[in-house]
Amino acid sequence: MLEEYTRPARYVENSHIVTKPALSDAELIDFENVGTLESFNTDGLRSILFTMAHIPNMKEKTLRYPGHIDLMKGLIKAGFLNTTPISFKGQEISPMEFTSSLLFDQWKLGEREEEFTLMQIRISDAEKTICYDLYDEYDTVTQTSSMSRTTGYTCTAAVNMLIQKLFTAKGVFPPELIGKDETCFHFMLNYLKERNIHYRKTEKPVHP
């Protein structure tokens, strides 16, 4: 988890891979249901850098509450996220592992603690911008966190897709290649919708 704050962030600009420090290019963005969040570069494109190389511009950013960037920069500057071991009372310890151990319990959700998951996907060309917005909350009925719902049900959707032989290609495939198949794409969204996880799609002209 902490590595996303230290690993250089790669994105695509004018069909070239560009690398910048994590936490760079900060923006404040307003979201319905949540309010203002700050976004920053993280190395989240991963396989998409290569599987979607025909797309000239791609960027992934992480969203957190305002103030998060300065907090993490403070930890980095103080050395808490260094991976090089240091000597402490005769023992070699990794600052990164030490910090992770300290924060692990702080990150744990309390029993029935409510949280939410937010994601926005924006796709633009010369004519229009298409947005897919996801907002999901803790399910009080099933007592399931939104992160468990949005990730877990996506995995079980993929398993059901294979069982129903909707995706029959052989080999190892990242999710974006499965999504290129329109049938699989709609199966995934409908599966999530049945479990009250909704991606809201909107379209706007680039030049109204």
Please annotate each region the language model reported.
Residues M1-P208:
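C-terminal catalytic/substrate-binding lobe primarily of soluble NAD(P)-dependent oxidoreductases
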